Amino acid sequence: MDNFNVVANEDNQVNDVKPPPPPPRVCARCDSDNTKFCYYNNYSEFQPRYFCKNCRRYWTHGGALRNVPIGGSSRAKRTRINQPSVAQMVSVGIQPGSHKPFFNVQENNDFVGSFGASSSSFVAAVGNRFSSLSHIHGGMVTNVHPTQTFRPNHRLAFHNGSFEQDYYDVGSDNLLVNQQVGGYVDNHNGYHMNQVDQYNWNQSFNNAMNMNYNNASTSGRMHPSHLEKGGP
């Protein structure tokens, strides 16, 4: 058994040993000795393949020579054309100055100014239903800054009474100016009133207020407590 293993090991060692390379040969085409061994063609020791460094061509020893031009085995170098990459094309197409934000500082100021003017005109139109805005804290409503926010239920005195105005998020895209005078106006976009109806409503309201004021003043003058007592 031991002898069998020794024989097997010797056979494996013999099989693992690679055959020595063949001796250098002269090029079969140009007769140059500047050659090198490459490999065995089809794993056969009888077909060693060589490469000639002089004419840059391969040949197999003992095989037929093909009609290969000088340097035909090497690939010709292709000239590269410097083409811009996709990233460069995108960067050139999109310049830093061409991209503008939706609102820059100047446009934002212009927008706020125009929006403030529209909101002020709307508040002035609502205020005209009751009286001139000069009686309402010296025109405070007309000078509303578009980005200023008031607390809800901000009371403004009006003659002998008062009315409430609620401002929510003045200066945002959705202006909510709620007027609590017998009802709420949720949005100035929903406030539509004919000029003729508004004028008639103002006249009737002013007449009613004047009548109430005259009656109150007349009854106060005619009250017995206001009569001066005469006599000795």
UniProtKB/Swiss-Prot annotation:
Family annotation (PROSITE patterns): ZF_DOF_1, ZF_DOF_2
Protein's recorded name: Dof zinc finger protein DOF4.3
Cellular location(s): Nucleus
Keywords annotated in UniProt: DNA-binding, Metal-binding, Nucleus, Transcription, Transcription regulation, Zinc, Zinc-finger
Task performed by this protein: Transcription factor that binds specifically to a 5'-AA[AG]G-3' consensus core sequence.
Pfam families associated with the record: Zn_ribbon_Dof
Residue spans, zinc finger Dof-type: 25-79
GO cellular component: nucleus
Span of the signal peptide: none
InterPro entries listed in its UniProt record: Dof (IPR045174), Znf_Dof (IPR003851)
Gene Ontology MF terms in the entry: DNA-binding transcription factor activity; sequence-specific DNA binding; zinc ion binding
Keyword rRNA-binding attributed: no
Gene Ontology biological process terms, A to Z: regulation of DNA-templated transcription
Gene, per the UniProt record: DOF4.3
Binding site for Zn(2+): 27, 30, 52, 55
Domain of life of the source: Eukaryota
Residue pairs linked by disulfide bridges in the UniProt entry: none
Lineage: Eukaryota, Viridiplantae, Streptophyta, Embryophyta, Tracheophyta
